[in-house]
Structures are given as C-alpha cells and as structure tokens.
C-alpha cells in the first residue's frame, strides 16, 4: 500500500488535483479503456438529438442516499442549487437545462421553476433511498443503465452545475470538450 501507484480512499470522492500527474494520466488511460455497451451508447445518442445545435446547461443534483450515506459529501439544498441555476441561466441564456436527479421532489420543483426549458431523462426517481427495495424488475441493472446514460448526456452539455459525485466526475472525464464547471 505504500507504493505511489495506489490511492487509498476513505470512500470520499478523490480530489484529482492532488494526484501525482503521472498517476493521474494512468488513471485517465484506464478510464479510456472502458467500453460502454452499444445499446447504452445508442440510447444516449438518440436522446442527445435534443442537444443538437443548442446551448445546454447540465445540472447534476444529487439526493437520495447522498444525503444520508456515511462519508458522502453533503449535497447543496434546493434553494442553493436553484439560485445558481437561475443566475447562470439568466447570464448565459441557455436553450435548455438538462437535469439529472434521482429525487422526485427535485424534478417537480425544477419543472415548476423552469417549465418547458427543462429536459431530463425519464428514469427512476424516488422520495427515498433509490437502493432500498426493488420496485421494478432488474432494478439495480436499470439504475446502472440510467446512470451511465445520464453521465454520457452530462458530458455533452456546455456548462455543468454539480456537487461532488462520481457521476459528475465521470461526465467531465468522458467529455470530449472542455466542460465548463460551475
């Protein structure tokens, strides 16, 4: 474990700015070696047509288990995230706001504020921990499928508002452009 090629984590998100650059480059090579199933890529590409020639603000607003899980960074509250979304949208005038959240109430509130400007993937959302129980057949597989699709779509936006999460970190890594983070 004392080898510099390992990163010991206490299960918090890793601050990639503190990783030795050589090690970080290896990490990026490993990420590039991952292959995403063709059906997931096709699903994301089909949805991505809504992004075509549009200025998109991506918002990844965690809820669910991140609010209660041990050692998870605590997410911003709704007032904080909506305030920054409004501020950035008023300044840059986006065509759409692409919201990724697993909380039913967050989606409902965003729809109330942004209406038809809001776009989102029709996927599982809950008012509880999304990992509690199995409300649909193949629930865990479908959560993974939807998460990867959302990650791919977030990687295609022009600007990204997010709290600390692995999904937003992977969207930044997966993005082929210099994704502007807010």
Where are these regions (language model features)?
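Secretory-pathway luminal glycosyltransferase catalytic domains
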Residues: 1-94
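Donor-binding and catalytic core of enzymes assembling or modifying cell-surface/extracellular glycoconjugates
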Residues: 95-181
């Amino acid at each position: 474990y004392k080898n510099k090629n390992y990163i010991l984590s206490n299960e918090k998100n890793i601050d990639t700015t503190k990783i030795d650059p050589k090690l970080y480059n290896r990490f990026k090579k490993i990420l590039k070696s991952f292959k995403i199933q063709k059906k997931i890529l096709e699903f994301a590409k089909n949805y991505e047509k809504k992004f075509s020639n549009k200025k998109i603000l991506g918002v990844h607003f965690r809820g669910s288990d991140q609010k209660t899980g041990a050692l998870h960074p605590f997410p911003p509250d709704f007032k904080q995230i909506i305030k920054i979304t409004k501020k950035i949208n008023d300044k840059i005038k986006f065509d759409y706001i692409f919201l990724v959240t697993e909380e039913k109430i967050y989606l409902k509130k965003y729809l109330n504020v942004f209406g038809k400007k809001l776009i989102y993937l029709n996927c599982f959302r809950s008012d509880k921990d999304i990992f509690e129980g199995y409300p649909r057949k193949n629930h865990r597989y479908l959560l993974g499928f939807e998460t990867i699709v959302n990650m791919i779509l977030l990687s295609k936006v022009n600007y990204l508002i997010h709290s600390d999460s692995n999904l937003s970190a992977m969207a930044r890594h997966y993005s082929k452009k210099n994704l502007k983070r807010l």
